[in-house]
Amino acid sequence: MFKYTLDNKKYHTLNYFYKTKFNSKVFKVSLNGNFSCPNFKNGNGCIFCSHGSGDFAGNKEDDLVTQFNEVKTMMEKKWPHAKYIGYFQANTNTYAPLDILKEKYETILKLPNVIGLSIATRCDAISDECLDYLEDLSKRTFLTIELGLQSMHDKTLKLINRGHDLKSFDECVKKLKQRNINVVVHIINGLPFETKDMMLATVKYLNSLKIDGIKIHMLHVLKNTELEKLYNETHFHILTKEEYIDIVCDELELLNEKIVIHRITGDPTKEDLIEPTWLIKKFCVLNDIDKEMVRRNSYQGKRKDN
């Protein structure tokens, strides 16, 4: 049995990480802090964006406590002793003056059974002043900073209009790690015109940064995005389910086994999705990844030194 799992998975599951660290069931509560994104200044933001990553975050019309309690009330019916992490998910959650950040974060930290915060942001939206505050937060609670990279290749970053290059991302991660702040990185498989080798190179690069966790996504083309326009114009290749599973299993084999796998596929809404339609069946994808790892007699980190 693979060491970092409780349910026969062949990779380091988030459930295992939380259970061993906190000895409790832990839920991340997605929150919408009504933030914006600096990349909207560059036009329409990232070409895959539906104007506010975090489509399943709370209702921004509700205050943060209301958003949080709505989820907690449901969860505690089945798990009355659960603990919670406030997940600032929608848009760029450090893109505001420091006093506003403090007010939003501290409001959630004061709530009962909250053991930490997870803050989704961008490498170009964390000032030195903000870094100092995040370091302080990390000493008081379990803090995770989630950064979108998507790809290590500057050519791709420019194509998808990320608004930053690899150097900026690299410098940001190193600053966070120097302050002992947990870092989780988002990557996307199947970005336009990327080869399998390019996707695997991104994972090898992240190994070298000694990140704490990763979220692996499959590129999905959503309605009313710039990506939809590019897809209609170029008909770039969309990974098949079989191709995606093969790439993910290779990535798991390359990733250091201590890196926690926070996500291994996406779950876009059926109404907004154009391609790939196979992504709708999330649990089929997860099961097929498990089957392929078993078929390979493999596990996370098996080829980490390759």
Go through the PLM ranges and name each one.
Residues 1-85:
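N-terminal [4Fe-4S]-dependent radical SAM core
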Residues 167-226, 242-265:
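Conserved C-terminal portion of the radical SAM core fold
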Residues 35, 90-94, 123-125, 149-153, ...:
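Active-site-proximal loop/turn and secondary-structure-junction residues that shape catalytic pockets
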Residues 52-71, 75-98, 113-126, 142-168, ...:
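Core AdoMet radical
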